[in-house]
Design a protein with these regions (language model features):
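Single conserved hydrophobic/aromatic residue that forms the stacking wall/gate
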Residues: 1-6, 10-11
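C-terminal substrate-binding/catalytic lobe of Rossmann-fold NAD(P)-dependent dehydrogenases
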Residues: 12-20, 26-189
Length: 189
């Protein structure tokens, strides 16, 4: 919602494509968890998607994931019962374990986010952007989509298959973002 406020108030003369929200922390965590599970290098994990909000309603998606450009088959129960909740709650786990947030992980994610925007990436990235109805998500909410970044600009991947088991979760995170937008609108001019 911070980016939505920025796009409405602070940066009205900038194109909405210049406003993005940080989902890289969640994306990095998802890649790390999967790499550990598969005993692979993080940099060899490709096409992980984080849909929606930077909250516990986010939808980590491995159904298009590859390792070194090869498709992988993962146990659906592990994805739904272990992986998704772990990514969704990882920030809380760190705070509970350490007694404070992981500022180093957040700083690293900010660096990675800016680096991807500046230099592009050959992999899909999770980037919160202002929706325009992609994947039947309501327009004008900051929603994390799979994107490809080249030359300082991003394009939302428009051909990602969403596994049917994730459909309801996408609606939950969308509804949360719609509610947040409505709360914020009360305070905007």
């Amino acid at each position: 919602h911070n980016c939505l406020v920025g796009s409405e108030m602070c940066i009205r003369d900038s194109p909405n494509t210049n406003i993005t929200s940080l989902m890289k922390l969640d994306h990095n965590r998802a890649k790390s968890i999967l790499a550990t599970k598969l005993n692979e290098k993080v940099e060899d994990i490709e096409n992980i998607v984080i849909w929606g909000n930077h909250s516990t309603t986010q939808v980590p998606d491995l159904f298009n994931c590859k390792v070194r450009s090869k498709e992988i088959n993962l146990d659906h129960s592990w994805i739904h019962e272990t992986f998704i909740p772990r990514v969704q709650k990882r920030g809380g786990e760190i705070i509970e374990f350490r007694g404070l947030s992981s500022a180093a992980s957040a700083a690293s994610a900010i660096y990675d986010h800016i680096n991807v925007l500046e230099n592009g990436s050959s992999d899909w990235e999770a980037l919160g952007v202002l929706s325009s109805g992609e994947y039947n998500i309501k327009s004008d909410i900051m929603f994390s989509f799979p994107v490809v970044v080249n030359g300082g600009s991003y394009n939302i991947k428009d051909d990602v298959n969403i596994h049917q088991s994730l459909s309801e979760s996408l609606k939950v995170t969308e509804e949360e973002l719609i509610k947040e937008r409505e709360i914020i609108k009360k305070y905007l001019p």
